[in-house]
Design a protein with these regions (language model features):
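C-terminal effector-binding regulatory domain of bacterial HTH transcription factors
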Residues: 1-4, 164-169
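N-terminal leader segment of winged-helix/HTH proteins
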Residues: 1-52
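Charged, amphipathic alpha-helical coiled-coil/dimerization segments
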Residues: 2-17, 93-153
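Hydrophobic structural patches
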Residues: 33, 62-65, 155
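N-terminal helix-turn-helix DNA-binding core of bacterial DNA-binding proteins
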Residues: 38, 42-84, 168
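Alpha-helical linker/hinge and terminal dimerization helices associated
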Residues: 40, 44-47, 81, 124, ...
């Protein structure tokens, strides 16, 4: 096999490998990040569906609510998950119908609804979290831990660069 093409698995999902010149390094990095993120997300979605009969958005909502035991305002959930309130409402409606969450009016502003996990919601999330961690760890098991730590730091640098770039607009 030609060394430029890599392994068969790589050639089917490694869109950036065809871009070789250094002038396109930024684009190659972005495409590699996107490819890896999509591959991980696809596996997590499949596993959540198969093992827990749930979806990634439902898992994400439960996990975000869990970060604030006093409850998360609907608007804050939307902001954290980067979706509109219109997308969040039906999702929370379904979670409430399944008794995984409850909505309570804010003590400070009764127009604001705080979403809290029920005991059933906590139990469901507690079952999913270690499995999610295992799935992601399994996907990254062949990356040397020191290199993974470097990658984490580099991605932090990238995030900082993006935030500075956005602030400069």
């Amino acid at each position: 096999m030609d060394s430029d093409q890599g392994s068969p698995a790589q050639s089917t999902s490694d869109f950036e490998s065809g871009l070789k010149d250094d002038d396109r390094l930024d684009l190659r990095i972005w495409l590699r990040l996107l490819t890896c993120a999509n591959m991980i997300e696809r596996r997590v979605r499949q596993n959540l569906r198969t093992d827990f009969d749930t979806t990634l958005p439902r898992f994400d909502v439960l996990a975000q609510i869990d970060r604030a035991p006093e409850g998360q305002p609907m608007q804050e959930l939307s902001r954290r998950l980067m979706v509109t309130n219109g997308n969040m409402t039906p999702l929370v409606d379904r979670l409430e119908e399944e008794a995984l969450v409850v909505r309570e009016p804010s003590a400070k502003d009764r127009r604001v609804q705080h979403v809290k996990l029920t005991d059933a919601g906590k139990s469901a999330l507690e079952a999913m979290i270690p499995e999610n961690k295992r799935w992601v760890s399994d996907l990254m098991q062949y990356v040397d831990r020191d290199r993974a730590s470097e990658l984490y730091d580099l991605l932090g640098d990238l995030k900082e660069s993006i935030l500075k770039s956005e602030a400069g607009k």
